[in-house]
Structure formats: structure tokens, C-alpha cells
From Swiss-Prot:
Keywords: ATP-binding, Cell inner membrane, Cell membrane, Kinase, Membrane, Nucleotide-binding, Phosphoprotein, Transferase, Transmembrane, Transmembrane helix, Two-component regulatory system. Member of the two-component regulatory system YpdA/YpdB, which is part of a nutrient-sensing regulatory network composed of YpdA/YpdB, the high-affinity pyruvate signaling system BtsS/BtsR and their respective target proteins, YhjX and BtsT. YpdA activates YpdB by phosphorylation in response to high concentrations of extracellular pyruvate. Activation of the YpdA/YpdB signaling cascade also promotes BtsS/BtsR-mediated btsT expression. Residues 1-3, 67-74, 129-139, 194-565 are cytoplasmic. One of its GO terms (molecular function) is protein histidine kinase activity. This is Sensor histidine kinase YpdA. Residues 343-554 form the Histidine kinase domain. The keyword Transcription does not apply. It is found in: Cell inner membrane. It catalyses: ATP + protein L-histidine = ADP + protein N-phospho-L-histidine. Pfam families: 5TM-5TMR_LYT, GAF, HATPase_c, His_kinase. The modification Phosphohistidine is found at residue 371. One of its GO terms (cellular component) is plasma membrane. Signal peptide: none annotated.
Amino acid sequence: MHEIFNMLLAVFDRAALMLICLFFLIRIRLFRELLHKSAHSPKELLAVTAIFSLFALFSTWSGVPVEGSLVNVRIIAVMSGGILFGPWVGIITGVIAGIHRYLIDIGGVTAIPCFITSILAGCISGWINLKIPKAQRWRVGILGGMLCETLTMILVIVWAPTTALGIDIVSKIGIPMILGSVCIGFIVLLVQSVEGEKEASAARQAKLALDIANKTLPLFRHVNSESLRKVCEIIRDDIHADAVAITNTDHVLAYVGVGEHNYQNGDDFISPTTRQAMNYGKIIIKNNDEAHRTPEIHSMLVIPLWEKGVVTGTLKIYYCHAHQITSSLQEMAVGLSQIISTQLEVSRAEQLREMANKAELRALQSKINPHFLFNALNAISSSIRLNPDTARQLIFNLSRYLRYNIELKDDEQIDIKKELYQIKDYIAIEQARFGDKLTVIYDIDEEVNCCIPSLLIQPLVENAIVHGIQPCKGKGVVTISVAECGNRVRIAVRDTGHGIDPKVIERVEANEMPGNKIGLLNVHHRVKLLYGEGLHIRRLEPGTEIAFYIPNQRTPVASQATLLL
């Protein structure tokens, strides 16, 4: 009995050594990451198999010799590997351990039994991994280990040259080997404690993502470069990153942290890695690589931002040290990117709705603007006596202009030719007022055939006449041009007035305009929200040019009538 007790202590001693090694292994972040994953790559499975195979080989080497047999914890190593990482690890480890056990004692009493049960232990452990709930694996693992050791004892008795020798060996090593299988449960429980840490870490990451969302929510009400920069600062500070960036499909919208100076001189185009993430709609992780422009960065996480199923940008997280992108950080960042995507989509929808409301208000103002009606009626009354035909045409222009405005819907997409007809009616009335002072030139590409939101061009024409031509003493020219430009259509309004004040351009870009100039800012907002970039405003010598671009989406036209230029 004393000898059996000593052997049991030897088994627990070697199992304890394995537990200690595992304890230190799970302190290593890379190994802990393997434990957290639900699926592993072949390379990762190969690494884990090598670790548990070494445990199994060491168990055989350190075994206590007894009558041609070895008291060891080989089955514990094989079972633990299979239960924790799946059948491939268990079976391959079992085969390696079994072959090694056979080769070090070819022809030995226990060589064949140990070879057989080592492989069987790998198969059983793999089955436990696939079929048994995690909470029960440690218990079933103990039973599986005891079953394998019991089978080993039976095979030793059967395989021994004499039954007496087999029984003698089993009587000495059977109890220690079978009871030692309890250590399988200890190992599995140790790893499950890491799983508990994973769940706690996931809870912390979820709370962190929600905290960041709460802090950034007010900033998404009015999205601009400054608000996005503050969002990046909050994310960087809360997750202790070295740099954070947000991009759209072409440019870096905001960048905060290490390497920020690389994005301050207009060189803000996205990197090839970011382009790849957007093209494939997949997360890209680089854990040991230099960033595109910042060699100090060695870890990078690029997550696509989605709106209505389309990638509209990315969230990028950087660290100076390598291997900083953990699975928990990735999961948190993915959740955070989903929140940001939702907030951006809601913000865009709200701004579109607000712009549509302002456009409707602007249309209503045009409909009932007493000054416009007063001037139009004055022009008509003056023409009645001098030129009745002109007066009749002006009445027709005015009625068609008012009917067009009344029938408008919020951001309705209309044929660009229909929009230009409405502008011609407006200009006809204005030309009646200004006479020879106002000349309008139409530079329209007749091949252009697309749809645009209503009331995008008319406010620009009104701005050119009222703020460009009217203040001048002499004659003035307004040019309206529509032309194809690659895969887009360029729409521009140019006047020969005094030229726009540069401060007005700055205020438009900063979204700050007085109430009496809401038309220009409204068009800038709507174009930017709908097509990604706002108005292009240039001060000329003389005059001003305001242009914007829309996609060249050809649509069928009911009538092929051309504009009367």
C-alpha cells in the first residue's frame, strides 16, 4: 500500500508540473488568445499539437519504471489537448505519444497496450470536445481518462507473457494511474477559468464600447471634420491606442495620435490597406507591420463602416508596438464600428431631412416672396402697354414657375431638362426687370440626360443675379453650363459681377451663413450629403463661379425636345 501511495504521489507530482507549465502558458497573451478562439487555423492547431505532444513525451520520459512498465501521465496530456482544442490535436498528440511509447520499449510488456490506449485517448478527447457542453467537460474528461487507463490495465493483463505477470504489474500501477486521471479535470478547470476571464473581458469591452458611444453620440448630431476628430480622441483615450482615424471612401476625415503631422498638409488620401478593407468589406489586422506613412506604427486594425449595406468608410486603430490587436479588442472595435456606422447613417438621414425641410421652406418662400411677386407683376404691367405679347409671355412664365414650385416634393428626383425649363421661366421674369443689364448664356450639353434633386440650380442662378449682377453698375452676364465630365456631370453657374467675398466661401465651408443667404448654404449641404462633396466656389476676375458634380446616371426621357437657348 505504501508503494502504491508513493506512485500516486509521483503521478500527481508530474501532473502538477504540467499544470504549472499550463498556468504560465496561459499568462502568455498569444496562448491565451488561442484559448479564447472558437476556431483555429491549421498553423495554430499545429502549434498547440506540438505543445501537448511535448507534454506527452515528457510524461513518458519522466515515468517511474515498474516491472517493465511506466507510471506516467501521458494519457492526461493527450486527453487534455483533445478536450481543450478538438479532435485533431487529441488524435495527432495520441498517435505521437503512442508511437514514442512503443519505440522506447519495443517488445515491452506494456508497449502495445500503451500505444493503443494513447490513440484511443486522443479519439475520446476529441469526441468530448465536439459533443459535451463546456461546463461538463472536466467531469467527462476524468471519466474518459479513467476509462482509458482501465483499458490499458486490461490490455496489459492480456498482452503480458503470463497472466500472473500482468496482474502483478496492474496491482502496482493500476490504482495510481486510474486515480491520476482526476488531474484531467484540474487542467480543464484551469483553462475554463481563462474562459471566465474571457467572458469578463467581453463584458468590460462591451461596457467600454457603450461608454464610448455615449460620449460620442452628441458629436454625431453635426458631423464635420472637427466633430470626427473629437470622436477619434475619445476612442484613442478610452482604448489606450496610439492613434485613431476615420476615413470615407477616398480621404482621411480625421486622424489623432502618432503620425498626425503626416495628414496636415492636404495629403489625406487613404492607404492601400484601407482601400483593400473597403473593396472586400473585411476587417484587416496587421500585427507586425509598418503603417503606410508612419513607420512608428506596427499594429493596425482597419474596420469597414457600413451604411445601408455599402462600405462608406473605415475606422482605423493603431499601436506603436507589435501584436497589440487582441481578439477582445477586435470584437470591441467591431461593435464600436457598428455603433459609429449607425450613428453616421442616422446623422446623415437627419441632415438630409433637415435640408429637405429647408429646401421646402425655400420653395415656399419663393412662392410667396412678396418682393419677387411685386417685381414680376411690375415688369408685366410695364410690358402690357408697350409690348402686350411680351406681357402675355411673362404671365405664362410666371404661372408655370409658380405651378412648378407648388408641385414640388421633398428632394424629388427630376429630369435635369425639366429643372432647366423652370430656371428659364425664372430668368425670363428677371430679364424683364433688368432689361439689357442682364444677359444669360446657356452652355448645355444636349447629350446629358440625368436626374437631379429639385431646386439645386435655381438658387445658384438667383444668387448670381441678385448678389453678382444687380450690385454692378454696368451690364452683366450669367452663364449656366451643364456638361459631362468623365463619369459625372458638371453643373456650373458663372457671373461677371464683383466677385464673391472670400469670407463668404469660408463661411459656406464652415456651415455658417446668415439667414438671408440660406439658399447657397442649403444647396452646398444637399449636394455634399447626396454626392459626397459640396459646392466648388471660385472667385474669378471678374465674377464668381459656383459648380457641383453629380453622377452621370442616364435615364429615359419622355420628350426629346431640346431647350430653346
